[in-house]
Amino acid sequence: MVEEKKKKDKESKYAYKKKSAWEVFTKDQIKKAFDFCEGYKKFLDTAKTEREAITYINEKIKKTGCKIFINRDKEAAVVVPGEKPVAEGVRIVISHIDSPRLDLKQIPLYEDTNSNVALFETHYYGGIKKFHWVVTPLALHGIVVKKDGSKIVFNLGEHPGDPVFSVPDLLPHLSYKVQDVKKLDEAITGESLDIIVGSKPAKGDFSEKIKTALLDKLYKEYGTSEEDFISAELEAVPAYKARDMGFDRSLIGAYGQDDRACTYTSLRAIMDIKKPRYTAIAFFVDKEEIGSEGNTTAQVTTFLRSIIKKLDPHVDVDNVMLKSKVISADVNSAVTPNYTDVFELKNASTLGYGVVMSKFTGHGGKYSANDASAEYVAEIRTLLNKNKIPWQAAELGKVDNGGGGTVAKYFSRLGMEVIDLGPPVMSMHSPYEIASKVDIYSAYLAYKAFLES
C-alpha cells in the first residue's frame, strides 16, 4: 500500500511546479531577507507620499555618485552608465510612488454645527474600498504653497505626541437603515469621508467659533490662511507604522506597499550594481493609481527622452527605445484566505513564493493590457532561473472577474520590451497591506540581476 501511494504521488519530470522561496533560499539568504526588510520598513514609514519618496530617493542617491534626474519633485530617474553605448539600448525598472489615499479638497475646512466639530472635506484618490478609511487613524502629509511661492511642509500624525485625524462612523445601534441594508460599496459615500480636525471653540462673537479657532491656530503655527489651501497638496494617509506580522515575523504589514515595495527594491538594486553591461535606469513615476494622467507620469515620454539625450546627445532617441528592455515593477494580488474563489489558483500568486511575473494585465479580453512577447518572457524566466531567484507566474484573478493595469502599456507603446514583475501583496489598496519578506527580497534580487544583465 505504501509503495502504491508513493507511485501516485510521483509527478512527471517535465511538470512545472512553483517553489517556495523559503525552500529555495539558504539559511543565510533568509537572514539577508529579514535584514533587508528592516530598511524597507523604515522607508515605508518615511515616504508615505510621492514627494516624500522622491526626497528619500534623492538623499540616498546623493551619497552614491549615481546620476539622478528629478521632474517637479514627483518623478525621478536614477542612472548608472553601462559598458555598452546608450545607442544600443538601456535597461529600465519602473515603479510608481503614489498610493491610494484621501486628498483634501481645495476649500476643505468647515464647521458642523449639529455635532460641534470641525472637519476637512476630502476627495479620495485611487481605487479604494471606502469603508476601509473610516475610524482609521490618519496623518496629514503634503505641502501648502503660499501666494509668494514659499512652501510649507506638513507632516502631522506620525511622531510620538502628534495628534491624529479620523473619519467618524455611525454606531451599529443606529446604522441599520442608513448602512447595514445597503450594498458594501454604497454604505459609505465619497462625500462622507471627511476627517475630524478639531472641536475647541474660539472665545468671542464669531459665527463659526470652532472653524475660527482652527484658522487662528493654523496661521500661528504654519502662517497659512484659508485661501492658501487652494494651492496645497495635502494627503490624509494611515498613521500606522510598518510592522512585522505573525509569530514568526515572516510578513510585513504597512500602508503603501503598492507600489513602494517595488520603489525600495529597485532603488536598492540600482544602488548596489557596479558596472552594468547596458546603461541602467531606475524610474520612479507618479499618479499610476489614477491612470498615469499628468506631467509626472509614465504616459509623459518627454522626461525619459530628455534623459536619453543628456546621456548621449548624438543618439536617435526612438532607436534607443526600440532596443531597450523594461521591467514594470508593480505588485500583484496574493491569493487571499476566505476569498480564494475569485482566483484561478493555477495562475495566481501566493505569499512566500517569490517575485511574480505577469505576462499581461488588463481586464476582460486583455483590454488595456501590455501582453509581453513569449521571447521576452523566456528571457526573464531564464534570467531568474540562472540567478536562482524564486519566482512565480500569475495573472490578476479569474477571467471576467475584474482586472487591473500597470504602467507597462505606456512604455511598450514606445517600442520597448516590457513585462510586469513584482512581489505579491495581500489586502491591496487597503490602509494596511501585507507582504512576505522573502518576496520583497526576491524582487530586489530580480531587479538587480536584470539591471546588471
Regions found by a protein language model. Give the residues of each.
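N-terminal hydrophobic/helix-forming segments and targeting peptides
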Residues: 1-453
